[in-house]
Structure formats: structure tokens, C-alpha cells
């Protein structure tokens, strides 16, 4: 259940700080924030150009692999990232995240859910939905193919397309999602883009709460095709905590995204 694009850019020496912030927002071991399974994008901070679109069952762990913090896995972009940093100070990084209801089973949460499954006398597979993992494969295929159709080639660091199922589901406006990954200055005209960076949300639980609230409206926009204002009105009807009013009073809806 995708909905929110969260943008940031980091220096080479800030990679571990970024990884910790991603893990804070998208941990597989808790049920708040967002699911650990999602789409990510590396982009040229200076040219505002997509370099790579990928998927991960565990976004924080995959980021660490790409940046050489964890042992290299197949498909790691560590060499490309090192080459980029040899010529540039900052690298753009964006995550396209899902609701925690889409959290799949990954190695970091397996022990927790094995314990729950044993207590419930149920197969561990029954404890979590695999829909989240299936969705990221499909969405990755859609986004890479939409880029290829628009520009005539894959992103620079992508050597192939994604899911064949995803490739057959591309719609003309899907390229707008791809462009949102690397164009932070256009945040105000794109309602799926967070007004705070990955690290800002990690440092500010209230802002994270606001973006989690808006995620529900974004899901309705992307999944049901509702207009954003209509989706927002719909979720506000059930806002028993007064989250949206608090958001308005705090000035968060006027906050500028600075990456």
C-alpha cells in the first residue's frame, strides 16, 4: 500500500546517519512508521537525474550494502556510489514507502514472528502478509518501465527492467512518480511528497506522525484514483485525534522541503 515519497541527499561520511534514519522510519521490527519493504532511488543531486531505481525487503539494510557498511550483496551499487562521490559531494536518495500493514517477513523480524506463531500454533507465514513484497516487485517494474518509455533507456545504474507484470501495467502519468524522486523543488505541486527529509522525520516524531497521517490520503490517491483533496476530506472525517487541525495550527502544511 504505497503512498509517500520521502527525499534526502547525503555526503559520503553521512551514510551511516542516513542508514540509521531509514531504519528508524522503516524498521521491520515494529508496527509504526512505514514497512521496511519499499522502493528506493539514487539520483544525481546536481543534475536532478535518476541514477537507479531498486526494491528492497529491508530498505535500511539494502542502503548499508550499497554504501559498503554491510558486506556487498549481488546487485550492490557500491562501486557506482564510490565513483559518484569521487566527483560529487552529495548524492540524492529517495524512498517510496508502504504502510506497516504491508510489512513482509524478513530475516530481521523472523525471530519475533516465529515466537508469535508458536504461541498461536500457526505457520509463521500466517503472521505477516507477503502482499507488500509482491507490491514492491510490481511497482519497481512499473517505474523502471515508465522511465524507459519516457527517455528511451533505463536509468544509468539499472541494467534491466523490473517485474514483467509491472511492465505491462504502466500508465502515462507513472513517470510523475519517478520524477518526484529527484525533483525536491517541486514538492509543493506533488501531494505524495513528504515536506520533510528522511533525517528530519527521524529526528522529529511529530512530523513523522503528520506524514503517516497523510499517507492514508496518498494511498487513496494512488490506489483508488481519488483526487487528493477528496481523499484528505475522507480521512479527516475519521480524525478522532484532531491530527489535521494540529498539523494546520503548527504550520507544518506551510513547511518548505529543503534537501
PLM region spans:
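Boundary/linker segments flanking structured domains
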Residues: 1-37, 45-49, 60-259
